[in-house]
């Protein structure tokens, strides 16, 4: 079985990361959560009170405190800036609400895309984000564009937040997700869009395992 690159793109809370992790584990591939990298950059900007116009200061911070990944004893992904574990802080609402603005900064995207491409050279990889199939891995053997209704995505995020002990209002989440969809698909740099050769998959009404099986079937055709 040959190793391939699998790119999974889609809007916020469409289930990309959950599905990508399972597929990577099943195939023995590396999983890279690119969204966590943009969240880490956003966390750094907020922590240091940097506005979107203070690009040089943010890039300098990212050089001083590089983003890296690790594994917990239970196999869960950990995210670090420098040697500080920021796995949980990057999932807080303040980061979620600002990440689109930071991710739209061309120099930040350029820096992180370069790092993502470097990691992808290591072999079989599953990467999820907004522009993986169009910008980061345009040569990926399998590209998936994952979507779901705003209501369903808000429900998923609501349940995730409750499980993590994060206080959340469902109606607010719906508005935030719709607003983020607009920002992500209308930004000038690497907007969210489906690659021409991507497989379109609407996950509304499907459970995680059903989505995983559909993507694995597509992957196996290419191996």
Curated annotation (Swiss-Prot):
Q: Name one Pfam family in it.
A: Cytidylate_kin
GO terms in the biological process aspect are:
nucleobase-containing small molecule interconversion; pyrimidine nucleotide metabolic process
Give the source's domain of life in one word: Bacteria
GO MF terms listed in the record are: ATP binding; CMP kinase activity; dCMP kinase activity
Q: Which reaction does it catalyse?
A: CMP + ATP = CDP + ADP; dCMP + ATP = dCDP + ADP
Q: Which residues bind ATP?
A: 10-18
Q: Name one GO cellular component term.
A: cytosol
Q: Where in the cell is it found?
A: Cytoplasm
Task: Tell me yes or no: is Amino-acid biosynthesis among this UniProt entry's keywords.
Answer: no
Checking InterPro entries in the record gives: Cytidylate_kin, Cytidylate_kinase_dom, P-loop_NTPase
Q: Which HAMAP family match?
A: Cytidyl_kinase_type1
**Family per similarity comment:** Belongs to the cytidylate kinase family. Type 1 subfamily.
UniProt name for this protein = Cytidylate kinase
């Amino acid at each position: 079985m040959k190793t391939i690159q699998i790119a999974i793109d889609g809007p916020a809370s469409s289930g990309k990361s959950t599905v990508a992790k399972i597929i990577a584990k099943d195939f023995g591939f590396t999983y890279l959560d690119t969204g966590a990298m943009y969240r880490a950059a956003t966390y750094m900007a907020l922590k240091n009170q940097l506005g979107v116009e203070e690009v040089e200061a943010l890039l300098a911070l990212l050089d001083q405190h590089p983003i890296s990944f690790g594994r917990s004893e239970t196999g869960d992904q950990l995210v670090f800036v420098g040697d500080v574990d920021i796995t949980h802080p990057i999932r807080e609402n303040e980061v979620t609400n600002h990440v689109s603005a930071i991710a739209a900064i061309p120099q930040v995207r350029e820096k992180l895309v370069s790092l993502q491409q470097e990691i992808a050279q290591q072999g079989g990889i599953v990467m999820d984000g907004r522009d993986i199939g169009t910008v980061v891995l345009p040569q990926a053997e399998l590209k998936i564009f994952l979507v779901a209704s705003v209501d369903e995505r808000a429900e998923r995020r609501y349940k995730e937040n409750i499980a993590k002990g994060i206080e959340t209002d469902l109606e607010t989440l719906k508005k935030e997700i719709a607003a983020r969809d607009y920002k992500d698909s209308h930004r000038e740099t690497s907007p969210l869009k489906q690659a021409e050769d991507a497989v379109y998959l609407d996950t509304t009404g499907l459970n995680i395992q059903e989505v995983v099986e559909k993507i694995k079937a597509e992957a196996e055709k290419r191996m």
